[in-house]
C-alpha cells in the first residue's frame, strides 16, 4: 500500500482541524427578551401593548408550529474581541435537510434589517474590526416553520480567524474534487502532492502561537504558487455560475409566508454581496420583488443599486413561474406582459429568457408565444425528473407547433456524491467541485459546447448561496487542473454566448412539440375546484375586457380594476398553486380570492352590459369569443316564446327550471346580435323519447341506455355507424384506487388501472325536459359517501352536453 493512497484522508483530517481552529473565541449571549407576534420592524414590536418577557437561552424554549416571535438582546462586545472580526452565530438545534420547514429569522442590528438567518446561514459578520465595549441591539424576527414544536435559541458572539479559515478553503476546495477525479489520473496526483506538501508546512503543535501563524502563512503562500498559479489557468471546461434562490410562491406554506421568505433570502443575498465583490445573483418572478418592495423598500433600493452595478440579474420572463399545462394561452401571454413590463419599468432590463426550472411540463405552443413576447431562450431542469425516459438532449432547439424554434438548455448540476447515471439534476445547486464535475460528466452535448450553466443556492427560504459556496467560487475561478473553471456570469450572458457558439452547428439537436413531463401526472386533476375557478375567471376576464372596450364611450374603461384582477389571476397560476400541489390552507385562500374576483367582475360586466344594450323589448346576445358561434344560449328569466333575427329567422325559446334557453345561429365574433321578441311558431318536436325512457332519437343520434343509466348505443345518423365498440358502455363512471408510491397529490402511477369500481348505484333516471331546444335526462348515482348528479342535454346540435356534479 502506497502512502499516497491515504493522502486524501490525511488532508481531510487537517482540514477538519483547521475548520475548528478558525473559530478562535466564543462568548455566549443569554439575556434575551421575547414577545409573541408577527411584527415587520422593531418599532412595530414596541408599539404592541404586550410586554417583552425575559428569555434565558440556557434554560428556556420557544414553541411552534406556525408561530411568530420577536427576540431582542442588547449586547456589548467583549474586550477580548477588540480589534477582531466580530461574528454572530445562531442555532436552534433543528438541522433537518428541508430548510423550507425549519425555523427562519430576519436579523435587525440597531434597528436596521441586516440578514436572513436559516439552517444554511447561521453566521453573520457584524464588524471586521470590533471595538471592545461597543453595544449592539440584536433583534430577530422569528418564524417557527410548520414541522417542529419546540426550539432552542442559542446565540453567541465569536471571532473567526480569516487566515486560518482562508487556508481551510485553499485546501478543502481541491480536496472535494477527489471523488470525481480518476484515481490514477494526472490531475488527482498533482493535487494530492501539492496538498500533502501544504500539510507538511502546517505546525499544529501549539495553536495560535507565533510558530502556528507563521506556518499558516507559509502554507498559504505555497498553495498560492504551487496550486493556484502553477496548476491553474485551465479552461477546457467552463462552469458559468449564477447565484439563485428558487422560492415557491406557495407550497408547504401560504403566500403570506412567501412574503417573509423572500425578504429573508434577498436580505442574505445583499449582505453577502457586501462581503464578496465577484458575487452575481439572478432571481426571476417579479411577484417576489413586489412583495419585498411593499415590506422593506430600503432592501428593494439596494437591489436596484446592485442591478445598476451589473451584479443582480432580474430575469425570467413571467410574472411568476407559472404552470404551462392548465394556464390558457391568453394568461401565458399576460404572464410575459406583466413580468417583462415590471422588470423593464423597475430595473430597465428587457427579459429574454423564460426561466422555469420547476414546472411540470411545457406546452408545444410556448415557443410561438415566447418568440412573439420577445423571449429568445428557455431554461428548465424539471424534465430531469422523468420517471421512465431520460431526456436525450441538454442543449437543443425546441420547435413549437407552428415551427418557431427556441434555444433551450437544461441545467445538469448534480448533487454532491450523486451518480452521474441518474436522471435527476437540480436548480438548487451546490457550488462544490464534486457537483460541478458531476454536472459536466452528466452533460450530453459536449461535442458542441464546453460551458455548462450552474444555478446554485438553497431555495424556498434557504437563503440562496452560502459563504462556503462563494469561497469555493473564488478558488475555482483560477481554473484548477482537473476541475471546471468557474466564472460568475449572468444567465443572459451565458445564453447569448451559447447561441453564438452553437449557431449553424449541424450537431445541435431539435426537439419538436410538447416537452412532456413524465411525472406528477395527477397535477392535471388535483384540487379540481381551484382549477375550475381559474378557468372561469379567465373566461370572465375575456368577457369583461371586450365589453369594457365596446362600452368605453359611455363608461370609463376600468384599467386599474382590470390590472388588479390580472395580478390576482397570475399569482394563482403559480406552478404549485394551480396544479393542486400546495397545502390545504393555500386553497382556502384562493377559494376566497376567486369568489371576490368573480363578484367584482360580475359588477363591472353588468355595468357595461347595461350601457351597451339598446332599450326596448328585444334580446341582445353578446359573443365574446374570437369566432362566430351557433349555439344554445341561456337567457335567464326571458319571457319570450321565440326570438327573430334581422333576417327573419325565428328561434323557439324553451322554458327551463333555471329560466329559458334558445338555439341562436351565427352570433358574430367579438360582437353582438339583437333579436326581436315574437310569438312561437308551430313545429315538430326534434326529440323522440321511448315510453320506457331508455331510448332517445335526436336529429343526429339514436341513444339507448341500460338499467344503470349507461349508454349501450350511440348511433351516428349522419355517418350511419355505431359509435361505441361492441360490449362497451358510454357514460360509465369508473373509480380507480389512487395510491401513488411517493407524492400523493402529484402522482398517478402506471398501475392505477389495476383496481377499480364502476359507479352503478342508480338512484334517479328522469327526463326533466323535452322541448324545441333540448331534451334533458337527469341521473343521480351514489358512490360511497358521495352523490354524482348529471343533467345530460340532447341538443338540436351534433354534440351532447353532460354537466356533472359530484359532492
Segment roles from a protein language model:
Residues 129-214, 218-221, 234, 238, ...:
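Active-site and substrate-binding clefts of carbohydrate-active enzymes
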Residues 205-213, 245-260, 284-292, 317-333, ...:
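The substrate-binding groove and active-site-proximal loops of carbohydrate-active enzymes
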Residues 559-563, 571-797, 801:
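Catalytic and substrate-binding regions of extracellular carbohydrate-active enzymes
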Residues 214-229, 287, 293, 330, ...:
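Gly/Pro-rich turn-and-neighbor structural signature
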Residues 89-91, 108-133, 318-338, 346, ...:
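Aromatic/His-enriched, Gly/Pro-containing loop or helix-boundary segments
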Residues 1-242:
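Mature N-terminal, pre-catalytic/accessory segment of carbohydrate-active enzymes
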Residues 802-807:
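Short "domain-exit" segments at the C-terminal end of structured domains
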Residues 223-242, 264-276, 291-350, 364-372, ...:
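Catalytic alpha-helical scaffold of carbohydrate-active enzymes acting on polysaccharides/glycoconjugates
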Amino acid at each position: 500500500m502506497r502512502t499516497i493512497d491515504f493522502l486524501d484522508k490525511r488532508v481531510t483530517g487537517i482540514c477538519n482541524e483547521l475548520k475548528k481552529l478558525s473559530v478562535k473565541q466564543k462568548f455566549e449571549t443569554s439575556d434575551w427578551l421575547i414577545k409573541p407576534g408577527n411584527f415587520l420592524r422593531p418599532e412595530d414590536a414596541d408599539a404592541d401593548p404586550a410586554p417583552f418577557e425575559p428569555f434565558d437561552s440556557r434554560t428556556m424554549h420557544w414553541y411552534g408550529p406556525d408561530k411568530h416571535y420577536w427576540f431582542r438582546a442588547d449586547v456589548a462586545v467583549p474586550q477580548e474581541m477588540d480589534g477582531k472580526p466580530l461574528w454572530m452565530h445562531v442555532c436552534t438545534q433543528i438541522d433537518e435537510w428541508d430548510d423550507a420547514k425549519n425555523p427562519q429569522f430576519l436579523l435587525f442590528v440597531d434597528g436596521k434589517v441586516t440578514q436572513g438567518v436559516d439552517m444554511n446561514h447561521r453566521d453573520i459578520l457584524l464588524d471586521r474590526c470590533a471595538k471592545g465595549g461597543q453595544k449592539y441591539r440584536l433583534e430577530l424576527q422569528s418564524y417557527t416553520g410548520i414541522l417542529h414544536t419546540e426550539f432552542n435559541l442559542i446565540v453567541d458572539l465569536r471571532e473567526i480567524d480569516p487566515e486560518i479559515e482562508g487556508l481551510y478553503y485553499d485546501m478543502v476546495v481541491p480536496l472535494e474534487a477527489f471523488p470525481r477525479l480518476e484515481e490514477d489520473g494526472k490531475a488527482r496526483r498533482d493535487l494530492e502532492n501539492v496538498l500533502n506538501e501544504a500539510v507538511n508546512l502546517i505546525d499544529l503543535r501549539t495553536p495560535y502561537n507565533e510558530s502556528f501563524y507563521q506556518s499558516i502563512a507559509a502554507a498559504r503562500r505555497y498553495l498560492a504558487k504551487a496550486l493556484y498559479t502553477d496548476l491553474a489557468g485551465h479552461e477546457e471546461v467552463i462552469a458559468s455560475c449564477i447565484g439563485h434562490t428558487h422560492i415557491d410562491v406557495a407550497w408547504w406554506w401560504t403566500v403570506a409566508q412567501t412574503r417573509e421568505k423572500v425578504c429573508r433570502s434577498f436580505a442574505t443575498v445583499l449582505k453577502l454581496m457586501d462581503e464578496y465583490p465577484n458575487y452575481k445573483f439572478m432571481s426571476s418572478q417579479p411577484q417576489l420583488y413586489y412583495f419585498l418592495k411593499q415590506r422593506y423598500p430600503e432592501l428593494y433600493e439596494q437591489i436596484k443599486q446592485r442591478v445598476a452595478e451589473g451584479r443582480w440579474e432580474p430575469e425570467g420572463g413571467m410574472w411568476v413561474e407559472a404552470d404551462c399545462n392548465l394556464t390558457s394561452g391568453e394568461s401565458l401571454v399576460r404572464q410575459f406582459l406583466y413580468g417583462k413590463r415590471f422588470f423593464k419599468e423597475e430595473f430597465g432590463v428587457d427579459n429574454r429568457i423564460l426561466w422555469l426550472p420547476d414546472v411540470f411540463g411545457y406546452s408545444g405552443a410556448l415557443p410561438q408565444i415566447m418568440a412573439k413576447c420577445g423571449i429568445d431562450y428557455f431554461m428548465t431542469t424539471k424534465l430531469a425528473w422523468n420517471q421512465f425516459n431520460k431526456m436525450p438532449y441538454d442543449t437543443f432547439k425546441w420547435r413549437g407547433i407552428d415551427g418557431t424554434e427556441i434555444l433551450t438548455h437544461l441545467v445538469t448540476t448534480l448533487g454532491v456524491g450523486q451518480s452521474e447515471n441518474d436522471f435527476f439534476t437540480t436548480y438548487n445547486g451546490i457550488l462544490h467541485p464534486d457537483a460541478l464535475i458531476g454536472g459536466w460528466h452528466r452533460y450530453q452535448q459536449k461535442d458542441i459546447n464546453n460551458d455548462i450553466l450552474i444555478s446554485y443556492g438553497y431555495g424556498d427560504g434557504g437563503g440562496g448561496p452560502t459563504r462556503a459556496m462563494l469561497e469555493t467560487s473564488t478558488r475555482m475561478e483560477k481554473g484548477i487542473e482537473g476541475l471546471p473553471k468557474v466564472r460568475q456570469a449572468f444567465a443572459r450572458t451565458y445564453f447569448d454566448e451559447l447561441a453564438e457558439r452553437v449557431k449553424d452547428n449541424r450537431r445541435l439537436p431539435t426537439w419538436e412539440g410538447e416537452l412532456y413531463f413524465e411525472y406528477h401526472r395527477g397535477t392535471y386533476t388535483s384540487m379540481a375546484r381551484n382549477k375550475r375557478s381559474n378557468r372561469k375567471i379567465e373566461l370572465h376576464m375575456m368577457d369583461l375586457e371586450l365589453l369594457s372596450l365596446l362600452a368605453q364611450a359611455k363608461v370609463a374603461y376600468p384599467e386599474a380594476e382590470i390590472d388588479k384582477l390580472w395580478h390576482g389571476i397570475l399569482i394563482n397560476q403559480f406552478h404549485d398553486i394551480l396544479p393542486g400541489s400546495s397545502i390545504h390552507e393555500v386553497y382556502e385562500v384562493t377559494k376566497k380570492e376567486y369568489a371576490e374576483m368573480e363578484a367584482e367582475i360580475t359588477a363591472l360586466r353588468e355595468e357595461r352590459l347595461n350601457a351597451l344594450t339598446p332599450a326596448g323589448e328585444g334580446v341582445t346576445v353578446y359573443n365574446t369569443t374570437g369566432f362566430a358561434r351557433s349555439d344554445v344560449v341561456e337567457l335567464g328569466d326571458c319571457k319570450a316564446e321565440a326570438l327573430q333575427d334581422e333576417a327573419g329567422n325565428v328561434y323557439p325559446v324553451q322554458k327551463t327550471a333555471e329560466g329559458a334557453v334558445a338555439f341562436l345561429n351565427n352570433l358574430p365574433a367579438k360582437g353582438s346580435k339583437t333579436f326581436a321578441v315574437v310569438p312561437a311558431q308551430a313545429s315538430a318536436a326534434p326529440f323522440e323519447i321511448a315510453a320506457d325512457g331508455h331510448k332517445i332519437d335526436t336529429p343526429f343520434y339514436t341513444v339507448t341506455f341500460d338499467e344503470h343509466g349507461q349508454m349501450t348505443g350511440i348511433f351516428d345518423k349522419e355517418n350511419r355507424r355505431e359509435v361505441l365498440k361492441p360490449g362497451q358502455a358510454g357514460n360509465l363512471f369508473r373509480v380507480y384506487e389512487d395510491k401513488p408510491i411517493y407524492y400523493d397529490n402529484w402522482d398517478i402511477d402506471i398501475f392505477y388501472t389495476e383496481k377499480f369500481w364502476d359507479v352503478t348505484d342508480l338512484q334517479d333516471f328522469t327526463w326533466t325536459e323535452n322541448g324545441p331546444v333540448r331534451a334533458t335526462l337527469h341521473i343521480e348515482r351514489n358512490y360511497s359517501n358521495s352523490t354524482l348528479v348529471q343533467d345530460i342535454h340532447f341538443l338540436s346540435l351534433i354534440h351532447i352536453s353532460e354537466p356533472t356534479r359530484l359532492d
